[in-house]
UniProtKB/Swiss-Prot annotation:
Transit peptide: 1-32, 33-60
Source organism: Arabidopsis thaliana
Subunit-structure text: Subunit of the lumenal protuberance of the NDH complex.
Biological classification of the source: Eukaryota, Viridiplantae, Streptophyta, Embryophyta, Tracheophyta
SUPFAM superfamilies named in the record: Oxygen-evolving enhancer protein 3 (SSF101112)
UniProt topology in membrane: Peripheral membrane protein
Family: Belongs to the PsbQ family.
Identification of the protein by name: PsbQ-like protein 3, chloroplastic
Pfam family, any one: PsbQ
Gene Ontology terms for molecular function: calcium ion binding; electron transporter, transferring electrons within the cyclic electron transport pathway of photosynthesis activity
Gene disruption phenotype: Impaired chloroplastic NAD(P)H dehydrogenase (NDH) activity, probably due to a reduced stability of the NDH complex.
General function of this protein: Required for both formation and activity of the chloroplast NAD(P)H dehydrogenase (NDH) complex.
Localization (cell): Plastid, Chloroplast thylakoid membrane
Length: 187
């Protein structure tokens, strides 16, 4: 007794009404699922590629446009930061934070001092984290605790500056300077 094979499955981009595949219910469900997948893929691609056509710089050559087609306007990646650059950046930002005392406490420019504090702290955070990752695993817990206490103090100082509380700002400033003085000999 010979077993008859079902017709081979074939997938087309468009749904063919005359196809012998769609005669059974299971094949019909398969056809609907694949057409939904195709639709979703096409919508996804068109949603990302069509806006690119409107944002091309027409002054560039067509080969440059083709090379940048999948760039999606992302900035070029930064070159890899080294530990030496991170240490230099950490020292520079620490000096900026130490100068904030003049802005906040002596001149009472709370808003400007807070902006400078947040900018320097943001840059310092990235550099300090890179330095911690470069340290041997046995030294990292100490640096992580210094990292945590430093940036908690910076955050508290920022909130005290927003409230205009000079005594709290001075207290947190002294704490920050002490932590920074503890960090630099260990690096």
């Amino acid at each position: 007794m010979a077993i008859s094979k079902p017709p081979p499955l074939h997938f087309t981009f468009f749904h063919n009404q005359d196809s012998s595949i769609d005669t059974s219910d299971s094949n019909l469900a398969l056809s609907i699922d694949t057409s939904r997948r195709r639709r979703d893929v096409l919508l996804t691609i068109s949603g990302t590629l069509i806006p690119q056509l409107f944002f091309f710089d027409r002054k560039r050559s067509s080969s440059a446009n083709a090379a940048d087609f999948f760039n999606f306007g992302a900035p070029p990646p930064e070159p890899e930061r080294t530990v030496e650059l991170a240490q230099e950046g950490l020292r520079k930002n620490a000096e900026n934070i130490k100068r904030i005392k003049e802005i906040m406490i002596e001149k009472k420019l709370w808003k400007e001092g807070g902006k400078e504090l947040r900018r320097s702290a943001s840059n310092m955070k990235q550099d300090f984290y890179l330095i911690i990752q470069a340290k041997p695993p046995k030294d990292r817990p100490l640096f992580r605790s210094l990292y945590s206490s430093l940036f908690n103090s910076i955050t508290k100082m920022d909130y005290a500056a927003r409230d205009g509380d000079e005594t709290k700002v001075l207290e947190y400033y002294i704490n920050i300077v002490a932590i920074l003085d503890d960090i630099f000999p260990r690096i």
